[in-house]
Amino acid sequence: MKALMFEAPERAVLIQRDLPEPAPGEALVRLAYNSVCGSDLSFYKGVWHGSTYPVVPGHEWSGTVVDVNGADSGLVGVDVVGDLTCSCGTCRHCAEGKPTLCGDLQELGFTRDGACAEYMTIPAANLHRLPPGTSLRAACQVEPLAVALNAVDRLAVVPGEKVAITGAGGIGLLLALAVRQRGGEVTAFAEPVAERREAAAALGVSATVGGAPGDLVALVEKHPELRPDVVLEASGYPSAVQEAIEAVRSGGRVGLIGYRVEEVGPMAPQHIVIKMLTLQASMGPGTRFGEAIGLLSSGAVDVDALLSHEFALEDHARALDVALRRADGNTRSFFNLRT
């Protein structure tokens, strides 16, 4: 089978290897689509935490179960998506429903082979069935949509609240769709790339601004009716975190969703204290897979425009380049794994 391998930082190669064999309790999945996440790009550049080389990347995927080993045989032939988090299931964090904090955590696409391949093994317990007829292309966005829903819920967004988002990449745009599902209003998007601002505007956002320091603050000072109750920070840049803190209303909430391990910067924490803000981090899909599947399969959430650039695995160099440069209106590069 074909697989994309990250051998070392900034070294991605297409390889041929034997089909993997599922271990007890695992399933073998024939993959259909996998989208390229910002964390994949950081991993490719060598600036990601808790990852190992060499490894097959990819964790936003869809596919079909073709074999199981000691798991539910009824899964064979079923279209599925799955959680990248492979945790012990018994530690304190796992018992509290926080598997991303597990001390024995393994993650598909980072510490064990992921979905940029024709086939992949995965614990059967990580799989989620797709309703018949669900688009496998759209379904590769179930995992990031679940991440967005989990973040919006951790920030406790309620109907009628105003929300601003910094960063209009894939997760930022999905956050906007998740806010809408919770009845919130996205009043502003801060994003430096013009084509991505256009993508945000197409979602019906009240206003978009560039991502330079001070842009969002200037907007809400000029238009106080846009000042958000909540700011969701999806870019991972320290300057954007500071911008969120200054732009949100007094007594408001700031959600930290994006992060970049290579970025450091100064902060002015007095704004947090003086404005009595709540900062809330969010990582992973939590328990939102089922809801994300329902929203995509029913058409309540449309991700077609988000999936902007399709590639075969053979064209992986261009897929990564376009995504890294955020060129040509790229919001999500994705691989068609059945071409």
UniProtKB/Swiss-Prot annotation:
UniProt cross-references to Gene3D superfamilies, sorted A to Z: Medium-chain alcohol dehydrogenases, catalytic domain (3.90.180.10), NAD(P)-binding Rossmann-like Domain (3.40.50.720)
- Its EC number is 1.1.1.329
Pathway(s) this gene product operates in, as recorded in its UniProt entry: Metabolic intermediate biosynthesis; 2-deoxystreptamine biosynthesis; 2-deoxystreptamine from D-glucose 6-phosphate: step 3/4; Antibiotic biosynthesis; lividomycin biosynthesis
Name the positions where Zn(2+) 2 binds.
Answer: 88, 91, 94, 102
Q: Name one GO molecular function term.
A: oxidoreductase activity
The entry's free-text remark on the cofactor is: Binds 2 Zn(2+) ions per subunit.
| Cell membrane keyword on record | no
Q: Which UniProt keywords apply?
A: Metal-binding, NAD, NADP, Oxidoreductase, Zinc
Q: What class of enzyme is it?
A: oxidoreductase
Q: What reaction is this protein's catalytic activity?
A: 2-deoxy-scyllo-inosamine + NADP(+) = 3-amino-2,3-dideoxy-scyllo-inosose + NADPH + H(+); 2-deoxy-scyllo-inosamine + NAD(+) = 3-amino-2,3-dideoxy-scyllo-inosose + NADH + H(+)
Q: Which cofactor does it need?
A: Zn(2+)
Residues given in the record as Zn(2+) 1 binding sites: 37, 59, 143
Describe the function of this protein: Catalyzes the oxidation of 2-deoxy-scyllo-inosamine (DOIA) with NAD(+) or NADP(+), forming 3-amino-2,3-dideoxy-scyllo-inosose (amino-DOI).
Q: What PANTHER family has UniProt attached to this entry?
A: L-THREONINE 3-DEHYDROGENASE
Q: Which family does it belong to?
A: Belongs to the zinc-containing alcohol dehydrogenase family. DOIA dehydrogenase subfamily.
State the name under which the record lists this protein. Answer: 2-deoxy-scyllo-inosamine dehydrogenase
Per the UniProt record, the source organism is: Streptomyces lividus
Task: Give the source lineage, highest ranks first.
Answer: Bacteria, Bacillati, Actinomycetota, Actinomycetes, Kitasatosporales
* Primary gene name: livE
